[in-house]
Amino acid sequence: MSVAGLKKQFYKASQLVSEKVGGAEGTKLDDDFKEMEKKVDLTSKAVTEVLTRTIEYLQPNPASRAKLTMLNTMSKIRGQVKNPGYPQSEGLLGESMIRYGKELGEDSNFGDALLDAGESMKRLAEVKDSLDIEVKQNFIDPLQNLCDKDLKEIQHHLKKLEGRRLDFDYKKKRQGKIPDEELRQAMEKFEESKEVAETSMHNLLETDIEQVSQLSALVDAQLDYHRQAVQILDELAEKLKRRMREASSRPRREYKPKPRETYDFGESDQSNGGFSCTPTPKVSASSSFRSDKPFRTSVRSIPHLDQPCCKALYDFEPENDGELGFKEGDIITLTNQIDENWYEGMINGQSGFFPLNYVEVLVPLPQ
């Protein structure tokens, strides 16, 4: 730095100290200038804040944003043209739905519905990617350019103006001790910088319709995204409702328990002093009151075992009309399965309903 430059820096520093510490009065700028400066400062803060919040709106996960920034930097270093995109939450949800939909298989209503929903979520992610690109091109990039160019240039002019004001005020305070020509030059430079700064701020504020246009582009992009999203979700909702209608119109598949294996070991003499093996009967609430009586198997109306029948495991006392009563050990002819809990059968010429869990199926009903 030249001697003249060092002297100028000393003048400005000295004037700044006298104003901050000594309370010296500096040259006042007019109210119109200060009002423009205030509006420009607010514009700068607004643009910076809106840019930050827009990026957070499009890419809400900070960890994913940081990772994406790192990957984009690495791609530039490696000279890769295509950069990885932001992992949209709709896409991640869709991948999860599709994975489990495939695992559940086509036999599952839920699995098929998950596949439908997963494909729709992936379509939503693609639409969201398009929104990101559209907003970046027509909103984020223009505002970023405003920050990097116009606002930065205004800040440069204001900083230069402040420096020349300090230089001018220092020399004005020492009027008579410095040449008049030097004071005149300092005043002219100050006035020149003020005019340049004033012009640049005026141009920015008068052309703020450009920012309105950019904001309109943001809203248009959002509208387009939401229209497509509504269309995708409407189609998905209709698919799911159609699946529900189809499922409700199909006959319900009744659960058919496999018949239990029965063992009938007759008494036989063993050459080695063997024993007879008979299964221990299950004890029911009703049979517990008859525990002093010997176990017996009913011989009433025993049907041929070539027709559907079952064996009573417990006593059943009918409580309602249409129910069929029986005793433990009775053999009951099966005529129909009402639902997953009740059979219809006959014994001793009487027919009625009885609970499935009171009997053991010997010969199941035909499918």
Swiss-Prot record:
Recorded hits in Pfam families, A to Z, give: BAR, SH3_1
The membrane-topology field of this record reads: Peripheral membrane protein
Q: List where the protein spans the membrane.
A: none
Stretches for region Disordered:
243-293
Renumbered residue ranges of the record's region Membrane-binding amphipathic helix: 1-21
Is Membrane included in the keywords of this UniProt record?
Answer: yes
Major subcellular location class: cytoplasm
Task: Extract the ranges annotated as region (Interaction with ARC).
Answer: 218-254
Domain notes per entry: An N-terminal amphipathic helix, the BAR domain and a second amphipathic helix inserted into helix 1 of the BAR domain (N-BAR domain) induce membrane curvature and bind curved membranes.
UniProt name for this protein: Endophilin-A2
Q: Which gene encodes it?
A: SH3GL1
